[in-house]
Amino acid sequence: MDKNYGRVTIPTDADMVEETKQTAQRWGADAIRDCDGTQMPDALKSMPVKIYSTYYTTRKDNAWAQANPDEVQQVYLMTEFYTAMEEQAPLRIPLMKHLYQEQLKPNTIHDIKRWWEVIDRTTGEVVPAAEWDYEEESGEVVLHKPGAFHEYTVSFLAFIMWDPVHMYNFITNSWENVEHQITFDVRQPKTQRHVIEKLKQWLKDNPDTDVVRFTTFFHQFTLVFDEFAREKFVDWFGYSASVSPYILEQFEREVGYPFRPEYIIDQGYHNNTNRVPSREFRDFQKFQQREVAKLMKVLVDICHENGREAMMFLGDHWIGTEPFGEYFKEVGVDAVVGSVGNGATLRLISDIPGVKYTEGRFLPYFFPDVFYEGGDPVKEAKINWVTARRAILRKPVDRIGYGGYLKLALQFPDFIQYIEDICNEFRLLYENVGGQQPYSHFTVGVLNSWGKLRSWGTHMVAHAIPYKQTYSYAGVLESLSGMPFDVKFISFDEVLENPAVLDDCKVIVNVGDAYTAPSGGSYWKNPALSCPIKAFVAKGGGLI
């Protein structure tokens, strides 16, 4: 094989036929793809390359979503804290204050007294359903007899009327005259049947597609916008938008206890990755992972039966897929592609077990927030490449690629040249690694509440975007991603069950703010954890 050919995927568009051919030749690309907002040209389908087709299971079908409003995806939200002043009755709590009205709509189709919850945050007690009502016209919950100077919140279900990823792309690209895409819930019966049949027909209608690039499967990570269409709350690992009465009733039957909104809301922390997970939230995660894997397998099997590969994008509607969890390996996904923002996010992809190959979508994405007059996409590409390159030398992805509008990138010739250099350098590095295990001084164990499930992602909030409160801790994992050590992610529960899980480590790293999931919080009160760690150190092991 030509050393300057292969292992690279590039984006295309309907009006970029010759430009795609020229770029593919320069970069040595052996695969082309469409993206959100672009279209695969028929003229390129006969090229001697793999054709990736982006496939959306949860959106781009507004006719279905509008005809089945009860099966639109939902998210659990919590209002701000509202204080009842002395002798104030009733207390009125607006649900949608500081939320983007076009994105979300309170779910009043299902029983609100069953699926919503009003909590006295001063005492921690649930307000009986008989003591509050909802006024749909004003959008307010009304508490009839609040306690003086007590604080209250309302936890409620809302329909996702504008897919948050589509909304982000819409805003970033200043799209006009583009219909807002509604997110529908593939887990629910009618929609599930519709999506399965739609995929079968789509495969018949698109015989030139080699790889179905699922973007992604069923549940969006938590991404909520404020009244100014800015990101208000984001948790790349968040399960808050993987809920519906249908799913929650299934969950109740499995676990044998009634569901409470608070199991998701978690005092407003939304069970983000820094929270030590409760038993109920772990139960919910495990249930979701198993059910998501079962339905994923149905769609993946359909692809295989039609002679296509199934690739999963690690992002967007990826919640519940959990590539480092116990069910993912049973699905049969051929490949995983994900965005590479740094070394840790590269390892988040390249370390995934049980797939035929992995692919890193490098940055910058070809969007106008970077590719504008006066912009410097070469600088962003250099930072991205140099940051991730250390991790490639430890555990490379099998392929790299880019996404977005090729026409924007072509306006920057220096950028096109630099990416050509990156592609050639990547192929050289990959060939030199040659599938071998690089030298390692010893194994470092990263100890936290999550273990393998959050491999390389312990301190991530919005993927690779730095977050002030976790930036330094994330730097520890970023360093480890390219250092000459094997890295093993261990949970506190694993140590409690079998302390011998530490035996192949020479150093244990436990980093994070006090009382958080990365550091452990109350886990350390248990001598069944602290004593084995002390014994590990006494025998010569290191503890950071």
Features from the language model and the residues they span:
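Catalytic domains of carbohydrate-active enzymes, especially glycoside hydrolases
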Residues: V8-K50, E197-T215, F328, A335-G338, ...
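Hydrophobic targeting/anchoring helices
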Residues: L44, A63-A65, L199-K200, R213-F217, ...
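The substrate-binding groove and active-site-proximal loops of carbohydrate-active enzymes
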Residues: Y5-A14, A29-C35, A84-M85, S174-R193, ...
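Helical hinge/lid and interdomain linker segments adjacent to catalytic or ligand-binding clefts
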Residues: I465-I544
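Hydrophobic beta-strand scaffold residues
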Residues: A31, I51, A310, T358, ...
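Noncatalytic N-terminal accessory/assembly modules of large enzymes
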Residues: D2-Y56, Q66-M96, Y100
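Structural motif
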Residues: V8-V17, I32-T38, T54-T58, T216-F217, ...
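Polysaccharide-binding and catalytic clefts of secreted carbohydrate-active enzymes
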Residues: E71-E330, L348, G434
